[in-house]
Every structure is written in structure tokens, then in C-alpha cells.
Amino acid sequence: MAVQQNKKSRSKRGMRRSHDALSTAQLSVDATSGELHLRHNVTADGFYRGKKVINK
């Protein structure tokens, strides 16, 4: 089993963990239907960037 050779300080531990925070979901309003959707994702109606890409 791997064992560290020298103890890492609280500062180094904190610096390593500084990138682990979660961010909120980025939402956009669809131009055609006006509904909220995730950025860079198709809406529930099948629109992406103002164009119909999925036919139901």
C-alpha cells in the first residue's frame, strides 16, 4: 500500500481542494418557446439554438 513520505500541510490540502467546489447549473431561456434549459443542450421541445433538431 502506498504511504506518503512527508505529511502534507493544511495549506497544501486546501490548495488541492480549491478546485473541488460545485457550481450552479447554467440555465438559458429558449428564444422560441421561452422555457429554461441547460446551456449547450437541446430543449424538451427539440430545439437547439433556435432550430428544430429533434422531431417527435
Curated annotation (Swiss-Prot):
InterPro entries (UniProt xref): Ribosomal_bL32 (IPR002677), Ribosomal_bL32_bact (IPR044957), Ribosomal_zn-bd (IPR011332)
Pfam families: Ribosomal_L32p
Biased composition (Basic residues): 7-16
SUPFAM superfamilies hit by this protein: Zn-binding ribosomal proteins (SSF57829)
Molecular function terms from GO: structural constituent of ribosome
Organism domain of life: Bacteria
NCBIfam families: rpmF_bact
Family of the protein in this entry: Belongs to the bacterial ribosomal protein bL32 family.
Protein name in the entry: Large ribosomal subunit protein bL32
Native species: Shewanella denitrificans (strain OS217 / ATCC BAA-1090 / DSM 15013)
Highest classification ranks of the organism: Bacteria, Pseudomonadati, Pseudomonadota, Gammaproteobacteria, Alteromonadales
Gene from which this protein is expressed: rpmF
